[in-house]
């Protein structure tokens, strides 16, 4: 054994090791958007989309969670990772294998074999044995490999939660766009009805000798464009049904049952008081990055352990016999066994082990950099959504004022036209302005609804990891041992 240590010293790590450092969450400065946001002690609810108060949306998100092929793939990856963890863990246990064979040997009587005692006779060549092996794992290689596989299983579970959150967000955003298209269609249809009334009025004025053919032509001119916009919006609504059906893993026929949404957001989302430190355990993508770092750290341990001798305890016992009756090999005199240690050690490998350690070190640094980037992006997304929400709240007020002003202008122009105090061009301009401002108001409201979803997702969507975090990340920013 002592010799093995001396020989294994021929291969050294050569100073190869990781260089990455984890970024402490509390080291990231929060901006005014986060500091000014109302704080509470609560994170988003796991069923956060229910604040929109739309039963149809609730039902379709439930359908998507149950039927989405993307979630099914994520769940399969989790099962695969857990199975791989079981395979790795089994290497730490006692391995027992049994073998047995029964063979009857007929001996020929030709000149090559005989004549002799066995000529034209038969014998039995039988054996049965148990083989046992156990890895002592003196340097923790098998334990580290098992822990690495388990960490990867945890990572897959976090990635599944991230896939679920992304699916929920995609359904909500598609549903909001679906609702916006209905609102825009309603505006376009109302505009069409108004324009047709204007055409009828122009025609009556012409018949009464008060109007001109030019006024009638002006009233007719916008109609084709309004019809085109209506057709375009009806197409968008049909495509929206297909999109929502596909997100739920359904066919287009199921999407045809979707009715006009009835979204109503009457709540404000406050920020948790422990941001950004507790963001580590709330966002699935951050949690997955943490488990990736932990897994790569265990991979470093495996690479280090490969430089040392591997010692296994092996044994075999059983019965064997050549000759005699079929069951004669089971007698006590035919019993045999052997037991002892088996040693394998690296001596010269052309730099393979150092290359593997270098690769493991690079993998750890890559995982650390990925985690740091994920954390930075997570905090940025929270700030972005808060800035967007504050801006949209102001835009909503301005948009409502613009619609009210445009409607008042249109009403005044219409009354003046009916009384012959102005020409039709002023009415048409006022109507166009009202139509445009109504569209802007609907777009701002849809953006507000989406901004709420964006902020919830930025905070992790209520899919808390709980205690499912690497131990080294319990203390924020602590470097994973490796």
Predicted regions and their residues:
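Short flexible linkers and secondary-structure junctions
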Residues: 11-170, 311, 315, 347-357
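Outer-membrane beta-barrel architecture
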Residues: 86, 131-133, 302, 342, ...
């Amino acid at each position: 054994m002592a010799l093995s240590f001396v020989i294994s010293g021929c291969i050294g790590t050569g100073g190869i090791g990781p260089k990455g450092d984890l970024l402490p969450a509390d080291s990231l400065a929060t901006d005014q958007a986060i500091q000014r946001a109302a704080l509470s002690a609560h994170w988003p609810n796991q069923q956060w989309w229910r604040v929109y108060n739309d039963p149809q949306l609730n039902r379709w998100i439930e359908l998507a969670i149950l039927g989405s092929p993307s979630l099914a793939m994520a769940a399969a990856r989790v099962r695969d990772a857990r199975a791989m963890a079981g395979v790795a863990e089994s290497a730490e246990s006692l391995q027992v294998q049994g073998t047995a064979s029964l063979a009857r040997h007929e001996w020929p009587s030709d000149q090559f074999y005989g004549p002799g005692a066995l000529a034209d006779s038969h014998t039995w060549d039988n054996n049965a044995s148990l083989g046992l092996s156990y890895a002592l794992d003196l340097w923790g290689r098998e334990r580290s490999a098992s822990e690495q596989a388990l960490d990867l299983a945890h990572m897959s579970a976090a990635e599944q939660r991230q896939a679920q959150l992304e699916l929920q967000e995609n359904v909500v955003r598609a549903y909001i766009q679906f609702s916006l298209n209905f609102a825009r269609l309603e505006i376009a249809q109302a505009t069409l009805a108004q324009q047709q009334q204007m055409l009828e009025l122009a025609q009556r004025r012409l018949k009464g000798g008060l109007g001109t053919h030019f006024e009638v032509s002006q009233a007719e001119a916008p109609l084709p464009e309004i019809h085109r916009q209506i057709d375009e919006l009806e197409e968008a609504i049909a495509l929206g049904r297909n999109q929502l059906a596909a997100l739920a893993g359904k066919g287009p026929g199921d999407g045809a049952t979707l009715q006009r949404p009835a979204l109503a957001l009457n709540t404000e989302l406050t920020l948790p008081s422990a941001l950004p430190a507790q963001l580590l355990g709330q966002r699935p993508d951050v949690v997955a990055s943490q488990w990736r770092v932990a897994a790569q750290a265990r991979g470093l341990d495996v690479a280090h352990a490969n430089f040392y001798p591997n010692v296994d305890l092996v044994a075999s016992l059983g019965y064997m016999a050549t000759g005699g009756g079929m069951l004669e090999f089971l007698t006590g005199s035919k019993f045999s066994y052997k037991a002892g240690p088996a040693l394998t050690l690296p001596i010269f490998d052309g730099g393979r082990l150092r290359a593997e350690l270098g690769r493991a070190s690079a993998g750890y640094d890559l995982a650390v950099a990925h985690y740091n980037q994920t954390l930075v992006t997570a905090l940025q997304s929270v700030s972005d959504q808060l800035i967007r929400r504050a801006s949209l709240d102001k835009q909503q007020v301005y948009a409502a004022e613009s619609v009210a002003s445009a409607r008042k202008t249109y009403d005044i122009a219409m009354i003046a036209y009916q009384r012959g105090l102005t020409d039709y061009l002023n009415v048409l301009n006022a109507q166009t302005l009202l139509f445009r401002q109504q569209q802007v108001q609907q777009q701002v409201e849809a953006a507000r609804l989406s901004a709420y979803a964006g902020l919830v997702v930025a905070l992790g969507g209520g899919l808390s990891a709980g205690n499912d975090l690497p131990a080294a990340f319990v203390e924020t920013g602590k470097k994973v041992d490796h």
